């Protein structure tokens, strides 16, 4: 999980979602998981 000021899709399978008011990226590739912080 990377915590970044701005989250972006890295590949085609990345999805940008909102969970508990936080913007997150979920993906099949665990290295692409990101959270805005």
From Swiss-Prot:
Superkingdom of this protein's organism: Bacteria
Family in the record: Belongs to the bacterial ribosomal protein bL36 family.
Key word Ribosomal protein present: yes
Entry keywords, A to Z: Ribonucleoprotein, Ribosomal protein
Protein name: Large ribosomal subunit protein bL36
One of the GO BP terms on file: translation
GO molecular function, one term: structural constituent of ribosome
Naturally occurring in which organism (per UniProt): Cutibacterium acnes (strain DSM 16379 / KPA171202) (Propionibacterium acnes)
PROSITE patterns with a match to the protein in the record: RIBOSOMAL_L36 (PS00828)
NCBIfam families: rpmJ_bact
Tagged with keyword Isomerase: no
Any one GO cellular component localisation term in the record: cytoplasm
SUPFAM superfamilies cross-referenced by the UniProt entry: Ribosomal protein L36
């Amino acid at each position: 999980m990377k915590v970044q000021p701005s989250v972006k899709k890295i590949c085609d399978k990345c999805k940008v979602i909102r969970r508990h008011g936080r913007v997150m990226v979920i993906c099949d590739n665990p290295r692409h998981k990101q959270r805005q912080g």
